[in-house]
């Protein structure tokens, strides 16, 4: 769908404008506002310093298409029936009668525009989308691919729009690919290899790089190296390879941060910027070498599920420190929060919670007792459904394959290194979190218990653990269904 850009000068307006900046793969673990010191996200950190950042923000699925389809519709993946990255008919497009963020705003007098990555299965309905034009370039140190080329076009389109905004209130999404280019970096450095030299020191490995006991984590997580092509390619990396991976991730993050800076400067170059609420977020995170993981796949560790969620602008009361006493779910909460701030009624069927009271500095009377993330499959080569329940202190995960479970004390063990699910001392807490999962399944009409596992035995035939990986991965040995 084409986008006719408005050329009228912005005027003062009662309703706030909204600029949503989303960066694919952006984990909290690289954002300065969340305590990181690499200096990768200075423009994002500046926005955060003026507003509110939520620490415990968890996505509905640590995979692009299910997460995005859920985000823009305010529904969970089992409700949208977009459960993987596959196209139709494996996944179905969101029905036309389902209210979306774009439809609610466009029907309320807003100009709703979207630039950049979609991967939405119809959930961006209501937004006018402009497809970015890829602008190739070269990089002296790190491989760049179409992800980075498309971001150049996305940035140019968003800057052009925000430099000359419409008269009516607008909601604009600048949807960047990076740091997703990290996936291409893995492909360029697959298997045992010698890394290209880079300028500057290599980053250190995270404290939770090593897995202490492969036998004490669920089967699907033990064998991600068989299920996910990028994990197959990285299975036999040495520690220096992983450090180069982190350096590359930081590099792609700095690239997109510069583009975020350009978009923000365009926004604030006109009077409309003073009346615009900025939201910065991500569809999911990245392993960042934690648990020897790269990119994201069958796991719910915080590096993959805990994302930046930042608000700043008119009516948003600056917080001196991150909001860490609330569990938030951008997947469900973004839609009602923005509708509340814009004075738009939220459909009764939407399960999210408006965070507007917290953003205004008021008491948050309604909050989540727990939040959930879901997993089904990436491209149906291996299907291993799972669920995560994150409570105020503990994180519980369950996988249908092997009835696998994890329980982590997120206060004592934020790196999720010691699985307590089999520890008798935690049997009561485990039972409580099993009950929370049952509550979610019942309340949200989740079909989780009826789903089927499909994992070829050839993807489970070596000693558990990525360094022990043997043979090709599922993508190479199985035909797509």
Swiss-Prot record:
The modification 3-oxoalanine (Ser) is found at residue 64. The keyword Iron does not apply. The conversion to 3-oxoalanine (also known as C-formylglycine, FGly), of a serine or cysteine residue in prokaryotes and of a cysteine residue in eukaryotes, is critical for catalytic activity. Residues 453-481 are annotated as: Disordered. Keywords: Hydrolase, Metal-binding, Zinc. Zn(2+) binds at residues 225-226, 462, 469. InterPro entries: Alkaline_phosphatase_core_sf, GAG-degrading_sulfatase, Sulfatase_N. GO terms for molecular function: arylsulfatase activity; glucuronate-2-sulfatase activity; metal ion binding. Its EC number is 3.1.6.-. Residues 472-481 have a biased composition (Basic and acidic residues). The keyword Hydrolase applies. Its cofactor is Zn(2+). Belongs to the sulfatase family. Exosulfatase involved in the degradation of the glycosaminoglycans (GAGs) chondroitin sulfate (CS), dermatan sulfate (DS) and heparan sulfate (HS). 2-O-sulfatase active on unsaturated non-reducing end hexuronate units. Has a slight preference for HS-derived structures. GAG-specific sulfatases play a key role in the persistence of the major human gut symbiont B.thetaiotaomicron in the host gastrointestinal tract. PANTHER family: ARYLSULFATASE K. This is Delta 4,5-hexuronate-2-O-sulfatase. The lineage of its organism: Bacteria, Pseudomonadati, Bacteroidota, Bacteroidia, Bacteroidales.
């Amino acid at each position: 769908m084409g986008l006719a850009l408005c050329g009228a000068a912005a005027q003062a307006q009662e309703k706030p404008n909204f600029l949503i900046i989303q960066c694919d793969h952006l984990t909290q673990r690289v954002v300065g506002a969340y305590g990181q010191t690499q200096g990768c996200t200075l423009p994002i950190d500046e926005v955060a310093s003026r507003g509110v950042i939520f620490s415990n923000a968890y996505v509905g699925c640590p995979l692009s298409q299910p997460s995005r389809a859920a985000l823009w519709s305010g529904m969970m993946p089992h409700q949208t029936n977009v459960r993987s990255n596959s196209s139709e008919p494996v996944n179905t497009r969101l029905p036309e009668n389902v209210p979306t963020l774009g439809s609610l705003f466009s029907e309320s007098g807003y100009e709703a525009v979207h630039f950049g990555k979609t991967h939405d299965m119809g959930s961006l309905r209501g937004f006018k989308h402009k497809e970015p034009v890829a602008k190739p370039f070269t990089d002296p140190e790190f491989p760049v691919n179409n992800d980075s080329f498309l971001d150049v076009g996305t940035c140019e389109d968003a800057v052009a729009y925000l430099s000359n905004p419409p008269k009516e209130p607008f909601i604009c999404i600048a949807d960047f690919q990076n740091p997703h280019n990290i996936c291409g970096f893995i492909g360029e450095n697959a298997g045992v290899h010698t890394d290209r030299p880079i300028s500057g020191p290599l980053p250190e490995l995270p404290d939770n790089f090593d897995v202490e006991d492969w036998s004490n984590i669920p089967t699907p997580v033990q064998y991600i190296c068989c299920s996910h092509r990028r994990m197959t390619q990285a299975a036999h990396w040495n520690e220096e390879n992983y450090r180069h991976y982190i350096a590359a991730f930081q590099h792609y993050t700095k690239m997109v941060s510069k583009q975020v800076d350009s978009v923000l400067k365009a926004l604030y170059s006109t009077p409309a910027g003073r009346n615009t609420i900025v939201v910065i977020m991500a569809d999911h995170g990245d392993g960042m070498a934690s648990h020897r993981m790269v990119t994201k796949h069958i796991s719910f560790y915080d590096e993959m599920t805990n994302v930046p969620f930042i608000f700043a602008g008119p009516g948003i009361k600056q917080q001196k420190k991150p909001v860490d006493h609330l569990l938030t779910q951008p997947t469900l909460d973004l839609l009602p929060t923005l509708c509340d701030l814009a004075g738009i009624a939220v459909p009764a069927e939407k399960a999210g919670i408006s965070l507007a009271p917290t953003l205004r500095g008021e008491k948050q009377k309604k909050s989540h007792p727990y939040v959930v993330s879901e997993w089904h499959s990436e491209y149906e080569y291996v299907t291993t459904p799972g669920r995560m329940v994150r409570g105020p202190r503990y994180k519980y995960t369950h996988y249908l394959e092997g009835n696998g479970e994890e329980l982590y004390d997120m206060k004592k063990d934020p790196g999720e290194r010691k699985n307590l699910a089999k520890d008798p001392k935690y049997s009561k807490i485990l039972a409580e979190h099993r009950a929370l999962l049952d509550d979610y399944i019942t309340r949200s009409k989740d079909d989780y218990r009826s789903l089927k596992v499909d994992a070829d035995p050839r993807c489970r035939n070596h000693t558990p653990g990525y360094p022990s990986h043997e043979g090709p991965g599922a993508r190479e040995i199985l035909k797509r269904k």
